[in-house]
Amino acid sequence: MRPIKLMGHERSLTQVKFNREGDLIFSVAKDSTASIWYSSNGERLGTLEGHIGTIWSIDVDADTILCATGSADLTIKLWKIETGECVQSWEMPTPVRRVAFSPDNKRLLAVTDQVMGQTGTISVFDINYEGDYTKQQSKPSLIIETRSDAKKVTVAGWSANGDFIIAGHEDGYVSKYNSSTGEFIETAQVHGIHNEEKIASITDIQFAPEDKSYIVTASKDKCSCLVDVDTLELMKVYKADAPMNTAAITPIKDFVILGGGQEARNVTTTAESQGKFEARFYHKIFIDEIGRVKGHFGPLNSIAVHPDGTGYASGGEDGFIRLHYFDKSYFDFEFDTERAERAMASSAA
């Protein structure tokens, strides 16, 4: 599984994303520039320039027409992918930590930071696809403020039909909101309860690729969790030995990929084994760790799995994107119980 190394960012990666077809990779970093790459060979297609601060998040709509970026420069920008033109810029009161399109492309959520005396929010914008895409509303159609009894929201995403917004919080809780009214529905603690770690901030939420009926979370408490979207029930816990920054679910195979590592200031040497800078593969059902992939020389900040399940991309603190395509041994791997079940099914047929 030889990786393709994508070099184009001058500073640490903050997020990587595939489009729905999987032929493009979108990446953002602390260098204020977004990049678009061909996933087949790692060639850079172009850049999106206009931010003046760290870009924390990027998302692309389901039709690869528009993408959105959220930045520390207090703006959200909407881009026309074909030309690289910025068609809209929204000013926000605080840095924007996460952006995500709804499944039907009609809305965009943005998580803003709780700093400078401002309350953190989840803001929802209606997206207009008419004409040249520049006729966007200047204000959000919905603002969900952080509840007085809750810690700030760090990440958020949409349920399968866009009816709900699932948010991860600084204290390890996940919450569920009605995406039309902003009504709070329920919350549950999923991190900060599995070990003695005091810091339990949720760093990533990604949805199941097949039906979005459950999410995988990553947290600074050195764990990742599988959580049911309908009930917020904790389904599985994957325990690691370093803070986790990102987690993703693979289609085809029942695996979860985790990424993270010790922060640079806490690592006494630059060896990747010391900092635990590997992508970790766990069996989704049996929760066993089944392998690691090395390569980065700093924590992994973002992992995205190819929509077809044929590979994954990781963005690191070292400023590199590593694109891996799985070989035959990956697809052939089975636990004994899986092999036995398959044999029984074949004999019954």
Swiss-Prot record:
Cleavable signal peptide: none
Domain of life: Eukaryota
GO CC terms: eukaryotic 43S preinitiation complex; eukaryotic 48S preinitiation complex; eukaryotic translation initiation factor 3 complex, eIF3e; eukaryotic translation initiation factor 3 complex, eIF3m; nuclear periphery
GO MF, one example: RNA binding
Gene Ontology BP, a term: formation of cytoplasmic translation initiation complex
Presence of the UniProt keyword Repeat in the record: yes
Subcellular location: Cytoplasm
PANTHER family per record: EUKARYOTIC TRANSLATION INITIATION FACTOR 3 SUBUNIT I (PTHR19877:SF1)
Entry similarity comment: Belongs to the eIF-3 subunit I family.
Assembly and interaction partners: Component of the eukaryotic translation initiation factor 3 (eIF-3) complex.
UniProt name for this protein: Eukaryotic translation initiation factor 3 subunit I
Gene, per the UniProt record: TIF34
